[in-house]
Amino acid sequence: MGLPALALVLVAGLLHTQASPPARSFQLDYEEDCFRKDGSPFRYISGSIHYARVPRPAWRDRLLKMYMSGLSAVQVYIPWNYHEPLPGVYDFAGDRDVEAFLDLTAELGLLVILRPGPYICAEWEMGGLPAWLLWKPDIILRSSDPAYLAAVDSWLHVLLPKIKPRLYQHGGNIISVQVENEYGSYYACDYGYLQHLLGSFRALLGSEVLLFTTDGTRAEELRCGTLQGLYATVDFGPGSNVTEAFGAQRQVEPKGPLVNSEYYTGWLDYWGEAHASTSSVRVARGLEDMLQLGASVNMQYMFHGGTNFAYWSGADFKDQYKPVTTSYDYDAPLSEAGDPTEKLFAIRTVISKFQPLPVGPMPPATPKYAYGWVALRKYADLLDVLDVLCPSGPIQSQFPLTFEAIKQVHGFVLYRTQLPRDVLDPATLGAPPHSICDRGYVMLQKEYQGTLERDGQTALHVTGSTGDTLDVLLENMGRISFGANISDFKGLLGNLSLDSSPLRNWLIYPLAIDTAIQQGWPHAALPKSSSGGRAGPAFYTGTFETPGIAWDTFVKFPGWSKGQLWINGFNLGRYWPLRGPQQTLFVPGSVLHVGRPNNITVLELEGAPSTPLLLFLDRPLFNRTLSRST
């Protein structure tokens, strides 16, 4: 090559070098105790949103409101069981299209802090772990158990390749990825498990991505939840002393940025307890204290809570089983319906002291409509439609089998046997302690007898004759999502007995109620003749039309007891006005039809009012709690 040609090559190479954009990076700076984004000091102010609790048509509205609140990032959980409902069966369509959600965050200018689990807690069914893991009953979850690790690795090899191109280093907007979740609060304290996850995340995401952990501020939590190679962050709420809480982080991370990965703006609700609320003033003051220290904060667990549609609500275990309500409003800055609250504007004011707010107005609350009263009619008692709900027929077993043993994940299973003798004087139908998981609705000769409940009433008195049919409809109210009892098996875990004599020879019906309803049942079926009685499990149906709009609404259940609601085949979740505090269910406008009837299906479990009506309102009713005995 001659000198002129060589000179041209060198000049072209120099021009190419000058034109190349600088490498994107998001790193820890242990000298200056900060993050560095593309080499410059950086601090994020983030908020949590769970795409699985928000209908896809509302994603943009919620994210835009978060952006306009002054947030620079959102924190996002990925629930494994939402995407792998059965082993090797994956669902990333529609509301489950996590890639579309992440791409929308990027479009709106938000960074992402990703929390892909495999365990997430989040008050979500089984903490995001698939219930099919319990098909191997002796599996040790969240540990180095080879069976558990094999399932985790299989899942991560599907999920993380979708994440890698969206990492900040590769031109995306994901700046950091959490490994596991609050592992220090779990009894196993298995460092080999964390080491395995670290290796898997590095192998699938590369060496540059920032990986971190989150734990509470107690020493034992940080001891078991942290690992060299994972940056340790903490979580705490507005009631904590900020200096002391970050002092706990400094015990395990003497240098590096201060990070609160879950600053609690509110709290969750449990059935039977008062609606939780947290003062806007306290939340804003705590945020300002952290920002003055230069900390990065994820707010806000939650910034927008959303709804536990269908059967996705989890449960806690604190001396007793505590199922979470359908509403996940969380008293968050954005309400369950996505409306800005006083708390949001208090937070926004604090943020404005530390960084400029986006130019423009906050998007308004979504429109709501009170569609009014809708009359329903009884379609059928549940016992009269078992051929529809369990077309494959029952499973025979000498003793009851759990949901997991018959591979039923959510919902309901019916257990049927016969009385072995005449019972002229009331006999005790009872269950061993902790064996009703979670509620059992008892019928004898199709007559409703009452309810058995986990950590509640576990016996009823019955009379009958030899050969009378005894049915127990078992409801899974949500698997435990936090603590040591996460292997939460459902159904009848022990045998029922009659005056201490075990009952045998059961027919077990796994009910596919959602499958039938999504296929148009019962609205597309011929009318069913049914008893006029209102007690016990039964289906009720009705329709209503909207006045040319499909706006969000809230449905109230005057005189109803407990059950499940579907509109147009969409499972809106559990209602339980008798237990409270939640009195209404949120109905997103996106599930409603305009110009044609909206089909309502209700499964009432205990007893409907004599005149079955629903009332559609333009506001929620949260805070009414009656005693546990009601």
Q: Language-model segments: what does each one mean?
A:
Residues F42, Y448-G450, L572-G573:
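Short hydrophobic beta-strand segments in globular cytosolic domains
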Residues W59-G127, L198-V209:
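Aromatic-lined substrate-binding rim segments of carbohydrate-active enzymes
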Residues G2, V11-A73, G109-L111:
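N-terminal carbohydrate-binding accessory modules
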Residues A23, L114, P118-A151, L159-M299:
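Substrate-binding/catalytic cleft of secreted carbohydrate-active enzymes
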Residues G2, L149-I163, L167-V179, G184-Y186, ...:
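Carbohydrate-binding surfaces of carbohydrate-active enzymes
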Residues D38-S40, Y77-V89, G94, A122-A147, ...:
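Aromatic- and acidic-residue-enriched carbohydrate-binding clefts of CAZyme catalytic domains
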Residues H50-M68, P87-A106, S280, D425-A431, ...:
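Aromatic- and glycine-enriched glycan-recognition loops and surfaces
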Residues D425-K446, L470, F544-N568, Y575-W576, ...:
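Aromatic-lined ligand-binding clefts that engage carbohydrates, nucleic acids, or primary amines
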